């Protein structure tokens, strides 16, 4: 495998047209849960099945891109055995954008911390900009108080050890996350890891902020539908319960995806909307939304047309909504696919969803346009695909 000479947080296209993926190193001591993390996140392995995973004996590269194993950034995830060292890794640390270091929350921390410090020291000279993400893993094993206490202790010890080694290492960016394959904390943590690799993140966040303020939405996420990682969210804080709710809803809808696909394949049913969507700013709809209803929206935006002018097959964008009563009275969870691989999940006041449906849909079309424009700019700039 040919490796680039310089660190890069962006995938580039090599001369032969193949995409250089963003490299992420998955490190940690034996049995800390590295392979489980990779398998649960990207191969949909049920968490309980991780029990049967074989130990990793040599460095294994897993490729994820927009076509097959979809993720928003073409990734190359290096799953390493527990005994790997900087010298035996087989690639310079300058090749990696991010190191995800996994620590079993119930472990004796001495050994994992020494290994982490070894890699921080190894990376410092060659790639000081590398992101170190420490996953304090298997968190669900402990009670809430113990979990927080262990999390704090690990952070403290790592910081102390780094300061003992050299004051310079304090400059290395280290981020700590509590994770478990048994809940959505892993997806949330890995989403945050990816956010640092998305150049256009602030523009996407800006679009989501506008969507939220126009529709009175308290929270909106843009999810990658395959990996179930969120690409961006609006600027209000993420609370775990809302994130979990959105992940579960997305997972449930994805299980119905084959039904939508077969519809999408039947072209004559697709109606093109007018090329410029007309905003219905005061649109009110008296038709109440049925709870837990899934409704197909067939739309074709101007950017669906290739620039050559040749009519491309219209895309199918399903949408769905579910009332969150009684747990969240007066709130509706909505889902809108905005590109073939990205979906908007938003909480909306039920009154807005039911009474101002036109306004909501216009804002979805507007968001879709914005995301496609960003995608086009990204594509032109780096001639590579971050979003599909
Ligand atoms: N309770 C709990 N167990 C987990 C979690 N993640 C992984 N495990 C378990 O941890 C054990 C080791 O998982 P692996 O993914 O094989 O760990 P690894 O770090 O890849 O191991 P090596 O390849 O030997 O270095 C398995 O029995 C998993 O089921 C978690 O979040 N919670």
Predicted regions and their residues:
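Glycine-rich phosphate-binding P-loop
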Residues: 22-45
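Switch I (effector-binding) loop of TRAFAC-class P-loop GTPase G-domains
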Residues: 42-72, 84
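Inter-motif core of Ras-like GTPase G domains
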Residues: 85-112, 116-127
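Canonical P-loop GTPase G-domain recognition
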Residues: 130-132, 140-219, 238-242, 248, ...
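Short, flexible boundary segments at extreme N-termini or domain junctions of P-loop NTPases and their
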Residues: 1-29, 62-66, 163-166, 179, ...
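Conserved nucleotide-sensing/catalytic segment adjacent to the nucleotide-binding pocket
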Residues: 63-97
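Short hydrophobic/glycine-rich mini-motifs in sensory/regulatory modules
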Residues: 337-345
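A charged amphipathic helix-loop-strand protein-protein interaction module that recurs
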Residues: 204, 237-333
């Amino acid at each position: 495998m040919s490796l680039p000479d310089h660190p890069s947080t962006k995938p580039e296209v090599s001369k032969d047209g193949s995409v250089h993926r963003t490299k992420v190193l998955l490190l940690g001591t034996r049995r800390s849960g590295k392979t489980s993390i990779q398998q649960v996140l990207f191969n949909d392995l049920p968490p309980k099945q991780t029990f049967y995973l074989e130990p990793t004996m040599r460095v294994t590269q897993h490729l994820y891109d927009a076509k097959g194993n979809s993720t928003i950034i073409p990734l190359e995830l290096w799953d390493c055995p527990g005994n790997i060292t900087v010298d035996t890794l087989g690639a310079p640390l300058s090749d990696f954008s991010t190191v995800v270091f996994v620590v079993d929350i119930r472990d004796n921390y001495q050994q994992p911390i020494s290994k982490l410090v070894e890699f921080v020291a190894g990376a410092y000279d060659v790639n000081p900009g590398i992101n170190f993400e420490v996953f304090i893993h298997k968190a669900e094993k402990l009670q809430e108080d113990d979990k927080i206490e262990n999390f704090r202790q690990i952070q403290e010890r790592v910081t102390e050890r780094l300061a003992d080694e050299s004051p310079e290492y304090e400059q290395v960016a280290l981020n700590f996350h509590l994770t478990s394959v048994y809940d959505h904390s892993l997806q949330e943590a890995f989403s945050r890891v990816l956010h640092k690799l998305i150049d256009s993140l602030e523009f996407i966040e800006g679009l989501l902020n506008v969507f939220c303020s126009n529709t009175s939405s308290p929270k909106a996420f843009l999810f990658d539908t395959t990996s179930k990682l969120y690409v961006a969210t609006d600027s209000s804080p993420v609370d775990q319960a809302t994130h979990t709710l959105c992940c579960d809803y997305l997972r449930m809808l994805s299980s119905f995806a084959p039904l939508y696909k077969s519809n999408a394949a039947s072209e004559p049913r697709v109606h093109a909307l007018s090329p410029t969507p007309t905003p219905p700013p005061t649109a009110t709809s008296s038709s109440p939304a049925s709870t837990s209803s899934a409704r197909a929206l067939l739309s074709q935006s101007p950017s669906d047309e290739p620039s050559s002018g040749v009519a491309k097959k219209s895309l199918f964008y399903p949408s769905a909504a579910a009332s969150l009563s009684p747990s969240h009275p007066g709130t509706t969870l909505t889902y809108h696919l905005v590109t073939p691989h990205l979906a908007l999940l938003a909480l909306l006041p039920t009154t807005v969803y039911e009474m101002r449906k036109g306004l909501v849909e216009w804002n979805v079309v507007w968001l879709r346009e914005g995301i496609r424009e960003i995608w086009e700019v990204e594509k032109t700039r780096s001639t590579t695909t971050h979003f599909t």
